[in-house]
Every structure is written in structure tokens, then in C-alpha cells.
Amino acid sequence: ELKYQLLKKYSGYLSSLRQEFSKKKKKGKLPKEARQKLLHWWELHYKWPYPSETEKIALAEATGLDQKQINNWFINQRKRHWKPS
């Protein structure tokens, strides 16, 4: 009985919440192929892993990612895996 009353009272609110959550962009890993291309560049430039703007554009085109994703990947990669010599 209580469950029924609560559902009746809040069903509109619950369905609007459900809709809002389904709109949220799902976060996840970048596609494997894109990660492999970025890692390949990383390995070739490990001593100074800072791509130029031109290189970032080329990487974005090669991977199908946008430049913000490229920038974020390099920021995270340097933070997690780079030890400047």
C-alpha cells in the first residue's frame, strides 16, 4: 500500500530523473585503436612528450578524437607515466 502511494505521488518526478540520467554522456576509455596511435607517438617522443599544435591536429585526425581529448590524454599520460630525465 505504502509503495503504491509513493509510486503514485512521485512517478512523474522519477520518470523525469530517469530521462535526465539517460541523457548524461557515458564516460569510458578511448577507443583501443586511438590509444594505440597515441601510445606510439608517446614512445617515439618519450624524452619530451609535448606535441606541437600541428602534431595535435594530426593526431586528432588520425585517431578520430577531438583536440580536447588529445590534450587531456597527454596531460594524464605525463602525470601518470612520465619521469623527466
From Swiss-Prot:
Residue ranges the UniProt entry marks as DNA-binding: 22-85
One Pfam family matching this protein: ELK
Keywords recorded for this protein, A-Z: DNA-binding, Homeobox, Nucleus
CDD domains: homeodomain
Record-annotated ELK domain positions: 1-21
Listed transmembrane segments: none
Keyword Nucleus: yes
Principal location: nucleus
GO cellular-component term (any): nucleus
Compartments, record wording: Nucleus
An annotated Gene Ontology molecular function: DNA binding
Tissue/organ expression: Strongly expressed in ear inflorescence primordia and shoot meristem. Weakly expressed in embryos. Absent from leaves.
Matches recorded under PANTHER family: HOMEOBOX PROTEIN TRANSCRIPTION FACTORS
Function statement: Probably binds to the DNA sequence 5'-TGAC-3'.
Entry similarity comment: Belongs to the TALE/KNOX homeobox family.
Protein name: Homeobox protein knotted-1-like 4
